[in-house]
Swiss-Prot record:
NCBIfam families: Cof-subfamily (TIGR00099), HAD-SF-IIB (TIGR01484), PRK10976.1 (NF008213). Catalyzes Strongly the dephosphorylation of pyridoxal-phosphate (PLP) and moderately the dephosphorylation of 2-deoxyglucose 6-phosphate (2bGLU6P) and beta-glucose 6-phosphate (bGlu6P). Also hydrolyzes both purines (GMP and IMP) and pyrimidines as secondary substrates. It comes from the Bacteria. This is Pyridoxal phosphate phosphatase YigL. It comes from Escherichia coli (strain K12). Signal peptide: none annotated. GO terms for cellular component: cytosol.
Length: 266
């Protein structure tokens, strides 16, 4: 039996409207009451995820910004790995002149965007988290957990992915969390490596973990865990990368809570 359960949020545990269903909430409460360790493992910001956790009234570790931040059961920061200042600073302005691509910055407890995009707020049904606008060149590049780019066109983000990888190589970890969101963290940062650290803290190893995800930013975690489950609605790129992993249902069908109940509560 896996003693640690790690799950991504958007596209995985959350419903398509970015909320936790009553069924999912009840499942997590039952699971943690049984002594199973639940871990949020997401690209979201820790301020946002902390509110989701507190609303659930459960104790859980939080892996946020795709592994660049880890908080313990009491919300204390126990791990942080920031982008190098020079890289963060350059990323702030790399596509500033492209009106189709929005640049987002997670810096310590803050969220910045280079221009208004009200539709981004659709992700915040379970928490209150507001962005501030920034000007490239005026934002201090210290404490940046990730920079991410959103665009309605996946095709526009592909050359950006290639350019960032070509320029900085293993100093960065670049991945698509969704087809319309390209995320950049420091090299060596991933949900998988963060999960390894959390499992160790809890007295377990990766083989004692089961993980759920749907994006390329989940790839390391799904392959490193004792068992990785890919959502049915996941990127084809992820399914092709790990054909050995089990594909389950979709977040629209509450596939993760159903799977967890079958595994732990039936």
């Amino acid at each position: 039996m896996y003693q640690v359960v790690a799950s991504d949020l958007d596209g995985t545990l959350l419903s398509p409207d970015h909320t936790l269903s009553p069924y999912a909430k009840e499942t997590l409460k039952l699971l943690t009451a049984r002594g199973i360790n639940f871990v949020f493992a997401t690209g979201r910001h820790h301020v946002d995820v902390g509110q989701i956790r507190d609303n659930l009234e459960i104790k859980s570790y939080m892996i946020t910004s795709n592994g660049a931040r880890v908080h313990d059961l009491d919300g204390n920061l126990i791990f942080a790995h920031n982008l190098d200042r020079d890289i963060a600073s350059d990323l702030f302005g790399v596509v500033n002149d492209n009106p189709d691509i929005i640049t987002n910055v997670y810096r310590d407890d803050e969220w910045f965007m280079n221009r208004h995009r009200p539709e981004e707020m659709r992700f915040f049904k379970e928490a209150v988290f507001q962005y501030a606008l920034y000007e490239p060149g005026l934002l201090e590049p210290e404490g940046v957990s990730k920079v991410f780019f959103t665009c309605d066109s996946h095709e526009q983000l592909l050359p950006l992915e290639q350019a960032i990888n070509a320029r900085w190589g293993d100093r960065v970890n670049v991945s698509f969390s969704t087809l319309t969101c390209l995320e950049v963290m420091a090299g060596g940062v991933s949900k998988g490596h963060a999960l390894e650290a959390v499992a160790k803290k809890l007295g377990y190893s990766l083989k004692d973990c089961i993980a759920f995800g749907d994006g390329m930013n989940d790839a390391e975690m799904l392959s490193m865990a004792g068992k990785g489950c890919i959502m049915g609605s996941a990127h084809q790129r992820l399914k092709d990368l790990h054909p050995e992993l089990e594909v389950i249902g979709t977040n629209a069908d509450d596939a993760v809570p159903h799977y967890l109940r079958k595994l732990y509560l039936s």
